[in-house]
Amino acid sequence: MSFESNEYFDGNVKSIAFQSATLPGTLGVMDIGEYTFDTNAYEFMTVVNGALTVKLPGATDWKTFNAGETFEVEANVSFDVKVKVQTAYLCLYK
Amino acid sequence: MSFESNEYFDGNVKSIAFQSATLPGTLGVMDIGEYTFDTNAYEFMTVVNGALTVKLPGATDWKTFNAGETFEVEANVSFDVKVKVQTAYLCLYK
């Protein structure tokens, strides 16, 4: 068996797909930078190490999520992320 | 930039290397199975999602670590791991 990995934004974001005990997920790392992500499913994004500063859909302000914190994003929307230190995250899809 | 990823045990363990705010680290996924890891540095292993049942160096019993729990391993030793569900982990090296 081999886990599938994916790269985005010219390799600045890299993730490995896996099947958790409950939901499909990806485990990934983001380099320093700013990104806009599009969702295909409802997402539970947890910061594992580092921090993500996020502008959620419909929001006007940015909110920073640190290690251990989770934010949720609806399916079929976009959200913006600013990364100031290489950050590890876990995303579970519902 | 592109993050370096590595595979072990015929792809049953896959990780991405990154530089956290404090220490170098890897973020990885283990498939169901049993593995013996050799350490080159002092390791802080944190279970991100799933569980790892571990026999630490010199130990006779196995201990299960769940999501959010961390175990530490000296450099230049081996430790055994049993994985019963695909498990995501973070390893920081000192």
UniProtKB/Swiss-Prot annotation, chains A, B:
GO cellular component, one term: cytosol
InterPro entries noted in UniProt: Ppnp, RmlC-like_jellyroll, RmlC_Cupin_sf
The family this protein is said to belong to: Belongs to the nucleoside phosphorylase PpnP family.
Organism: Psychromonas ingrahamii (strain DSM 17664 / CCUG 51855 / 37)
Keywords recorded for this protein, A-Z: Glycosyltransferase, Transferase
One protein family per Pfam: Ppnp
Catalytic reaction(s) noted: a purine D-ribonucleoside + phosphate = a purine nucleobase + alpha-D-ribose 1-phosphate; adenosine + phosphate = alpha-D-ribose 1-phosphate + adenine; cytidine + phosphate = cytosine + alpha-D-ribose 1-phosphate; guanosine + phosphate = alpha-D-ribose 1-phosphate + guanine
UniProt function note: Catalyzes the phosphorolysis of diverse nucleosides, yielding D-ribose 1-phosphate and the respective free bases. Can use uridine, adenosine, guanosine, cytidine, thymidine, inosine and xanthosine as substrates. Also catalyzes the reverse reactions.
Keyword Heme: no
Name of this chain's protein: Pyrimidine/purine nucleoside phosphorylase
GN (gene name): ppnP
Single GO MF annotation: uridine phosphorylase activity
UniProt-listed Enzyme Commission number(s): 2.4.2.1, 2.4.2.2
